[in-house]
């Protein structure tokens, strides 16, 4: 559509475009154009309707939308972290969880029968409500557990969330799940289908798409609901058990679950789970399991946490649904390491609320083990409730004349020979210049969680590789603005090609230049070595000052680092000594890449050799204290033993204080800890 079209034609085009982009955000939670392009479309539509009132209508997007529903929400740090849960998938694993609770409390397994509160695990969006002196200050999504996004305006129309709690003093965090009920989801999609609008994929996507935008009216139209079930900070709240928390929330006017139950022992918890599994089809909302929590709050505190989850709670997942469908084709994807991964292209089938059309087949051995043929009817489930996976073949429905699938001997992208080494499970493209490997490797290198090079998106990377300007990430550092400015960024509002332009090209070159001094863990992770994610990269970067130091480390050196292990260490050493990797590292160095040492190396090891346990209520959150101690070389444990150097104890310290007294472990309050930090030359608590 051009600007020279008639006003009526232009109005029709603008109306269609704005409505399309609204749908992509509201229904799909997936905007496809930048904010400024969207704003330009809306602005032009409004101006056109102002000049031609006859075009305006109550249903026009110009009359019904406000500002662009932005994905850039204000970030907020949760006063206490929102942790994940470990999973159980059988009664035996639930019994094992019961044993682990006992061990976390320094008790022999089976020596005590614990009381648990059992609740349904709702498949929605986690929310944290923060109150000060009884007044709601903000609501935020879970985010990464430490930092979430404020969505306060969007939750205010959801029933069961009071904005004031009379008589309450201090800080309070109330946590729960925002969801869309099955009935609301079905009604929404029925209406959307009648109106020719895209359907929601599942209730959770419907809730997420409504909650994460800045038009509260749209949220209200979605009919979201909430169930609250937990407290973070809880100044002045008179509760001693998880069951007390649920009753207190209900008394304050919060929406709570009618399906919660307090039980005695893990067998009773398993019976609750079996009952909920049977009721699952009749539940008014999607749920993917039950949550079993140690009821006594003091025992929860004593049991403590692992690095990612509480030791006193577990999510017992419902059995995965299994569906039958047909493998219509098997395609091959080449990854950034060159590995060829087979994918089953399935006849679309509904599975656990979503349509499944693809499933990974892992490798050649997996296909051979199932004796898969194209055209086979197969049984499919979601592994862990998330990843579609082929379980087996329905042999009686195999088409006559079908033959076993032959795994390719050449890369589907570049045509180069693909090799499977003896003893290896994977088949790999051997072409170092394979475009698929180059593109994915550079995209991985530039991604936010690795080198964090802003502005280097998928489309630009593909063009740089296709043009021969970039073969691997080291080539990025030779790019100039002149080489980048004429590449494509996307389409204009009129359907033309939008180029990068000189200004954006210069910004990108500056971003690439700035990445030369990224933290060591980022540069190390960017190498794409087997099993080296953020956690492993961070742990190793805390020990060594440079990439060269890591290259000189032996398998034994690396294996001694906590949570690295020998298998990972062997993979790292082998990868770093590979001839191609050595040449690549030399090119990075020649390009001027000089990683900044990670924080632990720079500050030294003032607390090295000391083991701390932190318990009780302190003015500084316990997780902040633990992180601070760990940054300066200390080991932080969840239980008191003879090897504990110090117990940091606040109010209501509980059984850990008793254990420390029994074992004659030194006990420090906050003032004592600050004094110790000063004596050791470490900075004070933040």
Curated annotation (Swiss-Prot):
MF terms in GO: DNA binding; DNA ligase (NAD+) activity; metal ion binding
Annotated EC: 6.5.1.2
Xref: InterPro entries: BRCT_dom (IPR001357), BRCT_dom_sf (IPR036420), DisA/LigA_HHH (IPR041663), DNA_ligase (IPR001679), DNAligase_adenylation (IPR013839), DNAligase_N (IPR013840), Hlx-hairpin-Hlx_DNA-bd_motif (IPR003583), NA-bd_OB-fold (IPR012340)
Cofactor: Mg(2+); Mn(2+)
Active-site positions on this chain: 121 (n6-amp-lysine intermediate)
Binding locations of Zn(2+): 411, 414, 429, 434
GO BP field: DNA repair; DNA replication
Annotated GO CC locations: cytosol
Record keywords: DNA damage, DNA repair, DNA replication, Ligase, Magnesium, Manganese, Metal-binding, NAD, Plasmid, Zinc
Pfam family, one: DNA_ligase_ZBD
Keyword Transmembrane helix (UniProt): no
Residues bound to NAD(+): 35-39, 84-85, 119, 142, 177, 293, 317
Enzyme superclass (EC): ligase
SUPFAM superfamilies: BRCT domain, DNA ligase/mRNA capping enzyme, catalytic domain, Nucleic acid-binding proteins, RuvA domain 2-like
Superkingdom of origin: Bacteria
Function (record text): DNA ligase that catalyzes the formation of phosphodiester linkages between 5'-phosphoryl and 3'-hydroxyl groups in double-stranded DNA using NAD as a coenzyme and as the energy source for the reaction. It is essential for DNA replication and repair of damaged DNA.
Record HAMAP family: DNA_ligase_A
Family per similarity comment: Belongs to the NAD-dependent DNA ligase family. LigA subfamily.
Official protein name in the record: DNA ligase 1
Organism for this UniProt entry: Deinococcus deserti (strain DSM 17065 / CIP 109153 / LMG 22923 / VCD115)
């Amino acid at each position: 559509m051009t600007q020279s079209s008639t006003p009526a034609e232009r109005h029709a085009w603008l109306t269609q475009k704005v409505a399309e982009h609204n749908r992509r955000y509201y229904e799909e939670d997936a905007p496809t154009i930048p904010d400024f392009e969207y704003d330009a479309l809306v602005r032009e539509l409004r101006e056109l309707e102002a000049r031609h009132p006859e075009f305006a209508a109550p249903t026009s997007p110009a009359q019904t939308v406000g500002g662009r529903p932005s994905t850039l929400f204000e970030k907020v740090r949760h006063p206490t972290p929102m942790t994940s849960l470990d999973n159980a998938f059988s009664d035996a694993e639930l019994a094992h969880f019961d044993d682990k609770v006992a061990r976390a409390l320094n008790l022999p397994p089976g020596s005590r029968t614990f009381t648990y509160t059992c609740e349904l695990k709702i498949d929605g969006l986690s929310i944290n409500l923060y109150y000060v002196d009884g007044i709601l200050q903000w609501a935020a999504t879970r985010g990464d557990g430490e930092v979430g996004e404020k969505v306060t305006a969007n939750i205010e129309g959801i029933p069961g969330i009071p904005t004031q709690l009379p008589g309450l003093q201090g800080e309070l965090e109330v946590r729960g799940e925002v969801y869309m009920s099955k009935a609301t989801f079905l009604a929404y999609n029925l209406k959307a289908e009648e109106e020719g609008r895209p359907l929601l994929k599942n209730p959770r996507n419907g809730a997420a798409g409504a909650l994460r935008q800045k038009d509260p009216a749209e949220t209200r139209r979605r009919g979201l609901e909430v169930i609250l079930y937990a407290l973070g900070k809880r100044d002045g709240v008179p509760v001693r058990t998880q069951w007390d928390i649920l009753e207190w929330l209900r008394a304050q006017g919060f929406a709570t679950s009618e399906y919660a139950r307090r039980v005695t022992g893990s067998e009773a918890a398993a019976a609750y789970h079996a009952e909920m599994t049977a009721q699952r089809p009749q539940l008014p909302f999607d749920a993917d399991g039950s949550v079993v929590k140690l009821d006594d709050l003091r025992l929860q505190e004593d049991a403590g946490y692992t690095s990612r989850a509480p030791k006193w709670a577990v999510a017992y997942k419902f059995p995965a649904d299994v569906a039958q469908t047909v493998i219509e084709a098997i395609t091959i994807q080449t990854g950034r390491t060159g590995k060829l991964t087979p994918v089953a292209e399935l006849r679309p089938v509904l599975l656990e609320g979503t349509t499944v059309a693809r499933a990974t087949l892992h490798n050649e051995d997996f296909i051979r083990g199932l004796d898969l043929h194209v055209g086979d009817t197969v049984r499919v489930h979601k592994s862990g409730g998330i990843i579609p996976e082929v379980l087996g073949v329905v042999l009686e429905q195999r088409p006559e004349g079908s033959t076993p699938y032959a795994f390719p001997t050449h890369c589907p992208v570049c045509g180069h020979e693909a090799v499977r080494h003896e003893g290896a499970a994977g088949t790999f493209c051997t072409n170092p210049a394979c475009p698929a490997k180059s593109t994915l490797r550079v995209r991985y290198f530039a991604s936010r969680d690795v080198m964090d090079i802003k502005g280097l998106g998928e489309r630009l990377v593909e063009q740089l590789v296709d043009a021969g300007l970039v073969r691997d990430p080291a080539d990025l550092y030779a790019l100039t603005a002149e080489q980048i400015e004429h590449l494509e960024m996307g389409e204009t509002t009129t359907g033309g090609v939008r180029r990068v332009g000189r200004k954006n090209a210069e910004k990108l070159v500056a971003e690439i230049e700035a990445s030369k001094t990224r933290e060591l863990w980022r540069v190390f992770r960017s190498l794409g070595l087997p099993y080296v994610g953020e956690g492993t990269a961070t742990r190793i970067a805390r020990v060594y000052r440079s990439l060269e130091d890591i290259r000189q480390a032996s398998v034994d050196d690396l294996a001694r680092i906590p949570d690295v292990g020998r298998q990972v260490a062997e993979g790292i050493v082998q990868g770093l000594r590979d001839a191609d990797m050595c040449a690549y590292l030399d090119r990075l160095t020649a390009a001027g890449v000089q990683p900044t040492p990670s924080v632990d190396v720079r500050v030294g090891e003032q607390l090295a050799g000391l083991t701390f346990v932190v318990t009780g209520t302190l003015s500084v959150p316990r997780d902040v204290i633990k992180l601070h101690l760990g940054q300066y070389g200390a080991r932080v444990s969840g239980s008191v033993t003879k090897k504990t150097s110090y117990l940091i104890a606040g109010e209501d310290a509980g059984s850990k204080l008793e254990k420390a007294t029994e074992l004659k472990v030194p006990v420090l309050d906050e003032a004592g800890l600050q004094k110790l930090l000063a004596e050791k030359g470490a900075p004070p608590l933040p």
